[in-house]
From Swiss-Prot:
Residues 265-317 are annotated as: Homooligomerization. Keywords: Chylomicron, Endosome, Extracellular matrix, Glycoprotein, HDL, Heparin-binding, Lipid transport, Lipid-binding, Oxidation, Phosphoprotein, Repeat, Secreted, Signal, Transport, VLDL. One of its GO terms (cellular component) is multivesicular body, internal vesicle. Residues 79-254 are annotated as: 8 X 22 AA approximate tandem repeats. Sequence repeats lie at residues 79-100, 101-122, 123-144, 145-166, 167-188, 189-210, 211-232, 233-254. This is Apolipoprotein E. The gene is APOE. The lineage of its organism: Eukaryota, Metazoa, Chordata, Craniata, Vertebrata.
Length: 317
C-alpha cells in the first residue's frame, strides 16, 4: 500500500512540475464519438449529468438552436456546473478529514495541487458558458441572415471545450484518487498506532484476569472472614474518630456559650451605667426648664389681669 501511495505521489508531482507547452488539440471529426465519462462518486455522477447535457447541446439540433436563442441552455448548464463543483468541494472536505493522520507538509501539498485542478475544471465550465452566451448574441445580431458559419464554428468550439473538460476532469479524478490513497494510508497508520497503545493495556487486563482466577481458588469463607475483619476494623476506627470530633465540638460550643453570656452581661452593665449617666446629665436641665416655664406662665397671667379695664371706667369714657 505504501509503495502504491509513493508511486502515485511521484507521478502526480512529475505531472505538475512539467513546463512543456501544451500541444494544439487535434480537430475531432463531426461523426467521431468522444469517450464517455465514468465514475461512481457523487461528484462524478454530477459531472456525468453535465457531460450528457453538453453532448446533447453539441448536436445543435433545431431544438438546441431554439433554446440557445433563449437563456434556458445557459441556466441549465449553470445549475449542472454549480451542482458538480458543490459535490467536488464536499468530497474534498470528506477526504481532508480522513487525511488528518498524514504529515502536515504532505497534506498541504496535496491540497494545493487539488485546488489547482479544481480551479482548472471551474475555468473550463466558465469558458463553456461564455462561448454559448457569445453564440446567442451573435445569432441575435444576425437575424434574417444565414448562421451556418456560426453554427459550424460553435460546433468546433464545443468539441474542443468538451475534450478539454474531459481532460481536466480526469486529472481531477486522478488527484482525488491520490488524495484518497493518502487518507486510507493515514487511517491504517492510526489503527496501527492505536493497536500499539492498546497492546500493553490488553496484556495488563489478561494478567489481572489470571490473578483473579488464582484468588478464586482460595476458600470463599476465609476470604469473607478476612474482608469482614478489615471492614470491622475500618468502621471502628471511623467511629472513634467521629466520637473524638463530637467531643471537641461540644467543648468548643461550651466555650463559645460562656463567652457569649459574659459579653452579654458586660454589655448590659455598660448600658445601665450609660443610662444612669444620661439621666444625671439631663435631669437638672429638665427641672430648671420646668421652673422657668412655670415662672413665665405666672408672669403672663399677672400681665393679663393688670391690663383688663373695669366696667365703671369704661362707662365714664
Amino acid at each position: 500500500m505504501k509503495a502504491l501511495w509513493v508511486a502515485l505521489v511521484v507521478t502526480l508531482l512529475a505531472g505538475c512540475r512539467a513546463e512543456v507547452e501544451p500541444e494544439p488539440e487535434p480537430e475531432v471529426q463531426l461523426g467521431q464519438e468522444q469517450p464517455e465519462w465514468q465514475g461512481s462518486q457523487p461528484w462524478e455522477l454530477a459531472l456525468g449529468r453535465l457531460w450528457d447535457y453538453l453532448r446533447w447541446v453539441q448536436t445543435l439540433s433545431d431544438q438546441v438552436q431554439e433554446e440557445l436563442l433563449s437563456t434556458q441552455v445557459t441556466q441549465e448548464l449553470t445549475a449542472l456546473m454549480e451542482e458538480t463543483m458543490k459535490e467536488v468541494k464536499a468530497y474534498k472536505a470528506e477526504l481532508e478529514e480522513q487525511l488528518s493522520p498524514v504529515a502536515q507538509e504532505t497534506r498541504a501539498r496535496l491540497s494545493k495541487e487539488l485546488q489547482a485542478a479544481q480551479a482548472r475544471l471551474g475555468t473550463d465550465m466558465e469558458d463553456l458558458r461564455s462561448r454559448l452566451a457569445h453564440y446567442r448574441n451573435e445569432v441575435q445580431a444576425m437575424l434574417g441572415q444565414t448562421t451556418d458559419e456560426l453554427r459550424n464554428r460553435l460546433a468546433s468550439h464545443l468539441r474542443k471545450l468538451r475534450k478539454r473538460l474531459l481532460r481536466d476532469a480526469e486529472d481531477l479524478q486522478k488527484r482525488l484518487a491520490v488524495y484518497r490513497a493518502g487518507a486510507v494510508e493515514g487511517a491504517e497508520r492510526s489503527v496501527s498506532a492505536l493497536r500499539e497503545r492498546l497492546g500493553p493495556l490488553v496484556e495488563q487486563g489478561r494478567l489481572g484476569t489470571a490473578t483473579t482466577s488464582t484468588l478464586g481458588s482460595q476458600p470463599l469463607r476465609e476470604r469473607a472472614e478476612a474482608w469482614g475483619q478489615k471492614l470491622r476494623g475500618r468502621l471502628e476506627a471511623v467511629g472513634a474518630r467521629a466520637q473524638d470530633r463530637l467531643d471537641k465540638m461540644r467543648e468548643q460550643l461550651e466555650e463559645v456559650r460562656a463567652k457569649v453570656e459574659e459579653q452579654a452581661s458586660q454589655m448590659r452593665l455598660q448600658a445601665e451605667t450609660f443610662q444612669a449617666r444620661l439621666k444625671g446629665w439631663f435631669q437638672p436641665l429638665v427641672e430648671d426648664l420646668q421652673r422657668q416655664w412655670a415662672g413665665l406662665v405666672e408672669k403672663v397671667q399677672q400681665l393679663a389681669v393688670g391690663t383688663t379695664p373695669t366696667p365703671a371706667a369704661s362707662k365714664n369714657q
